[in-house]
């Protein structure tokens, strides 16, 4: 199999910019044997936190984003400014919040056999965990959507047992 040659990332982004918007927002630049190399654009409006067993590398190319993480039982905002890099450790619940006109490079390791991904939601008022679901990731489009539908379609799951707040579904970003 021929080895993919270097290419100009800025040119690639400009040629694919129309695809770096909702509802998908990301495109694979390399789908290699061990790594997934994605270019991700904003805006997004997700409220879930993603959990996986591998590290994720962020390089923010255009604009600033915030990666919300759960650290020592607290919600923490990690700003990543244009030109900055950030290596997220494995097994850290995280939610990258991307504004309009932002573009970043995200690299993550492909899942090993038996590894699981998870989606978690935390109360926006008191940070109590509302719901979590773990699964072996086979198809990100269908599996994530199924979990989203289960969570957002059930007000009991969205209601905080600690403070009674009800999480509303995220606004749709077009």
Residue ranges and their predicted role:
Residues 1-59, 64-85, 93-174:
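Jelly-roll (double-stranded beta-helix
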């Amino acid at each position: 199999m021929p080895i993919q040659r270097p290419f100009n990332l800025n040119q690639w982004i400009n040629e694919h910019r129309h695809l770096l918007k909702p509802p998908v927002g990301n495109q694979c630049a390399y789908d290699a044997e061990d790594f997934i190399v994605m270019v991700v654009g904003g805006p997004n409006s997700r409220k879930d936190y993603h959990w996986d067993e591998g590290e994720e590398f962020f390089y923010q190319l255009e604009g600033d984003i915030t990666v919300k993480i759960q650290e020592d039982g607290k919600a923490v905002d990690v700003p990543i400014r244009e030109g900055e890099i950030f290596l997220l450790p494995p097994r850290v619940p995280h939610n990258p919040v991307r504004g309009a006109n932002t573009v970043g490079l995200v690299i993550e390791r492909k899942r090993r056999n038996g590894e699981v991904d998870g989606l978690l939601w935390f109360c926006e008022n008191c940070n109590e965990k509302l719901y979590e679901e773990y699964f072996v990731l086979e198809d990100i489009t269908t599996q994530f959507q199924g979990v989203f539908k289960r969570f957002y379609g059930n007000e009991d799951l969205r209601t905080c047992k600690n403070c009674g707040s009800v999480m509303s579904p995220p606004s749709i970003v077009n």
